[in-house]
Curated annotation (Swiss-Prot):
Anthranilate 2 binds at residue 165. Keywords: Amino-acid biosynthesis, Aromatic amino acid biosynthesis, Glycosyltransferase, Magnesium, Metal-binding, Transferase, Tryptophan biosynthesis. It comes from Streptococcus thermophilus (strain ATCC BAA-250 / LMG 18311). The lineage of its organism: Bacteria, Bacillati, Bacillota, Bacilli, Lactobacillales. One of its GO terms (molecular function) is magnesium ion binding. Pathway: Amino-acid biosynthesis; L-tryptophan biosynthesis; L-tryptophan from chorismate: step 2/5. The gene is trpD. It is an enzyme of class 2 (transferase). SUPFAM superfamilies: Nucleoside phosphorylase/phosphoribosyltransferase catalytic domain, Nucleoside phosphorylase/phosphoribosyltransferase N-terminal domain. The keyword DNA repair does not apply. The keyword Protein biosynthesis does not apply. This is Anthranilate phosphoribosyltransferase. Its cofactor is Mg(2+).
Length: 334
């Protein structure tokens, strides 16, 4: 590790191979907690690169639990977290509607770190087994078109990194890596990101990982979701090209919703919010979720524009298709 630390201290970027070797050792529990913390902090101070992100993702995937069935058409819509917005579980709610629209959703997630309720916490309240076996996850992806991929189950070696991350208490490269380390080889992706200036770096990493199409979204105030106030910035990966764009709620003909109107609560409260959205109960939560679903359909290519995606989202919620996806997942992922 000494040579690696020297290189980072000289603000020299690491290659994919170098990072992959380091993380392979970390995931085998061959590196001390203090060294892991120093490594993560060093990369943060130096500035993370797409090669470094890709190297860590590949190391994690090589140690991940493998599903018995291969799926090559899946999508994930989880974000980095770390935005301190304390909003409700938007991407978790959205995944049921995206699945109802015909997208196979391999929704990655974890327990709460900075918010009151992580996706795993909410889904447990709803009776979904977040620690389901690989066999059950494959069945859910096949029969429901949706499964919740719990980070702790699919990446058991991540436990060696957790203490160092908790000790640091700040976002690191691991926040960027988490949404990209889905054990499935995703075809498309919608990724929320807490810093606009990292979008191009992450887009390059996503391209290196073989995604056909992706959208990386940062909302106003560096939210890792799109919001109905201020300006949203997204980077689009399409046909090998990377481009950055902005939009506002006014561009989509939607009403303004302040951040204070979509604050979440504990797992039980957020589960009730999720159900209210899928029941099509009018609220700021519904409008914000519909926006992010529309972005998901656009990221996948199911919709030609975000506005078209929003319209599709409204239809799938109104006709009960999205709520039915939840019911089916409750029956299968047990």
């Amino acid at each position: 590790m000494k040579e690696i630390f020297l290189q980072i201290s000289n603000r020299q970027d690491l290659s994919q191979d170098q990072v992959q070797v380091v993380f392979d050792r970390i995931l085998k529990n061959e590196v001390s907690e203090s060294q892991i913390a120093s490594f993560l902090m060093g990369l943060k101070i130096k500035g993370e690169t797409s090669d470094e992100i890709t190297g860590i993702v590949r190391a994690l995937k090589s140690h991940a639990t493998v599903l018995p069935e291969t799926f090559t058409d899946a999508m994930c819509n989880c974000g980095t977290g770390g935005d301190q917005s304390y909003s409700f579980n938007i991407s978790t709610t959205a995944c049921f509607v995206l699945a109802a629209g015909g997208i196979r959703m391999a929704k990655a997630g974890n327990r709460s770190i900075s918010s009151k309720s992580g996706s795993a916490d909410v889904l447990e309240v709803l009776g979904i087994n977040v620690a389901a076996s690989p066999e059950i996850l494959s069945k859910a992806l096949d029969e429901v078109g949706l499964a919740f991929i719990f980070a702790q189950t699919m990446h058991p070696a991540m436990r060696f990194i957790g203490p160092a991350r908790q000790a640091l208490g700040i976002p690191t490269i691991m926040n960027l890596v988490g949404p990209l380390a889905n054990p499935l080889d995703l075809e498309t992706q919608l990724m929320g990101l807490y810093r606009v200036e990292l979008q191009e770096i992450v887009a390059n990493a996503i391209q290196q990982l073989g995604r056909k199409r992706a959208v990386i979204i940062t909302g106003p105030d560096n939210m890792d979701e799109a919001a109905l106030y201020g300006t949203n910035t997204y980077t689009l990966l399409e046909d090998g090209h990377i481009s950055q764009h902005t939009f506002t709620y006014e561009d989509l003909g939607m009403e303004k919703v302040e951040l204070s109107d979509i604050t979440g609560g504990d797992a039980k409260e957020n589960a009730e919010i999720l159900l209210s959205v899928l029941r099509n109960e009018a609220s700021p939560y519904l409008e914000t979720t519909v926006l992010n679903i529309g972005l998901g359909f656009f990221a996948n290519g199911k919709a030609g524009t975000i506005k078209e995606g929003v319209e599709l989202a409204r239809q799938l919620i109104a006709d009960g298709s999205a709520l039915e996806k939840l019911r089916k997942l409750q029956e299968v992922q047990v």
